Amino acid sequence: MLVKSYAAAVQGISATVVTIEVNCTKGIQFFLVGLPDVAVRESHERIISALQVSGYKFPRNRIVINMAPADIRKEGSSYDLPLAIGILAAAEELDASRLGHYMICLLYTSDAAD
């Protein structure tokens, strides 16, 4: 099943909408395309762990994820949540009918005082 979700690529004070397309089919591979950096490519392991801890099962399907536009570099772990939600929706574990109406943004800051 093909589903779309939306995130944002933040560059300075501006942001570009990133369309995340997830397709689950039979197979066991995981592909992530659309100019992701190392942290985004490593999201696979973080997402599997987070879904298991949350009581979901990571689909044992071939998962292809396209992050568009392809010419904008996607950096950091802020895409983990929209990727995880897209994977669950494509695997029909979540209702995808309203997914296209929202942008899923995750921002983490660490400003712990020393």
Where are these regions (language model features)?
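Conserved small/polar residues in nucleotide/adenosyl-binding loops
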Residues: 108-114
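Conserved P-loop NTPase/AAA+ ATPase motor core
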Residues: 1-105
